[in-house]
């Protein structure tokens, strides 16, 4: 895999990694996590955080107009903020995905978007999440002709009946003509629900479940997963630890790989992710500057051939900025 470099925003902020920088310790297409690995990249100069404000759970797409678009979790009454860039390092606010929050699941917030380009449309998967009542969390889907929306909501795709009580953090992936959705999160014995990462095949337009029963692919100790194919391997990235305890956050990114999209995904140490995901290969963790490094985006390749890997983190010196 080509060397990556990272992008941060602070404390609920976004950070990045790109293939051209050896000095970033913190670590195209269609937003599908499938691609990259082009010719020798031209180095990029940047420093983290690249966006120093509250922008958790990033997802990014290289759009048909040549620009890059970044989408993040709801901020106040901005229902999935969208940012635009020509170079992956300088971002400007471009609007919100929704003018009004989808109202089919009350008392929830818009979390963890996942942007994709499917059949000539921009397709946005999103979570309507409830922190204290995970049974109320659901995944929906919306569509737009433009990367900046507004997106038309197509309603609920998945809820707790899908096989995991924590129905959050969707990740779309297309492979060999089939479309898949991955999702899930932790167990919580104190709240009485079972977690885990599951996947299911989608319809041709990506807007409904094809009908197959969902399958478990990773254990209940990771969330914010992302699937990427490079060469003959599929890579399953996920975040484990605590996300939201400011400088005490232990969020970190782990990864396993498989020769089949259905798994099993295995880390370098031989740990099978379906059994114990949190003990897989750690590729990104906090340091003396940042804590809670996780919920990474797709791997995106820029026009110069550099691979970028975006994630959020708490900047210890500026905790009030968020992650």
List where the protein language model places each region.
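Carbohydrate-active catalytic/glycan-binding domains of CAZyme proteins
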Residues: 18-323
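Bacterial N-terminal signal peptides
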Residues: 7-15
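Positively charged n-region of N-terminal signal peptides that target proteins for export
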Residues: 1-4
């Amino acid at each position: 895999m080509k060397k990556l470099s990272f992008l941060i925003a602070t404390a609920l902020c976004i950070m990045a990694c790109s293939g051209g920088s050896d000095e970033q310790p913190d670590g195209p297409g269609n937003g599908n996590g499938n691609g990259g690995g082009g010719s020798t990249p031209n180095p990029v100069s940047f420093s983290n955080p690249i966006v120093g404000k509250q922008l958790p759970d990033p997802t990014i797409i290289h759009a048909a107009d040549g620009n890059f678009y970044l989408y993040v979790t709801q901020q106040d009454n901005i229902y999935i903020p969208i940012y635009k860039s020509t170079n992956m390092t300088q971002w400007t606010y471009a609007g919100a995905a929704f003018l009004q929050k989808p109202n089919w699941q009350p008392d929830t917030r818009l979390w963890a978007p996942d942007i994709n380009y499917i059949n000539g449309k921009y397709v946005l998967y999103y979570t309507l999440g409830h922190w204290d009542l995970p049974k109320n969390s659901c995944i929906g889907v919306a569509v737009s002709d433009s990367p900046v929306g507004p997106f038309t909501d197509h309603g609920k795709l998945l809820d707790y009946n899908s096989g995991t009580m924590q129905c959050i953090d969707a990740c779309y992936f297309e492979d060999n003509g089939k479309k898949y959705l991955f999702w899930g999160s932790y167990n919580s014995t104190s709240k009485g629900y079972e977690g885990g990462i599951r996947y299911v095949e989608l319809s041709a337009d990506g807007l409904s479940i094809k009908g197959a029963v969902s399958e478990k692919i990773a254990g209940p100790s990771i969330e914010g997963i992302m699937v990427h194919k490079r060469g003959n391997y599929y890579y399953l990235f996920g975040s484990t630890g605590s996300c939201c305890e400011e400088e005490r956050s232990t969020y970190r990114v782990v990864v396993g790989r498989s020769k089949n999209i259905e798994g099993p995904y295995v880390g370098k140490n031989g740990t099978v992710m379906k059994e114990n995901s949190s003990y897989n290969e750690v590729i990104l963790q906090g340091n003396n500057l940042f804590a809670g490094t996780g919920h990474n985006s797709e791997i995106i390749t820029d026009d110069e051939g550099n691979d970028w890997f975006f994630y959020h983190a708490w900047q210890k010196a500026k905790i009030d900025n968020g992650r």
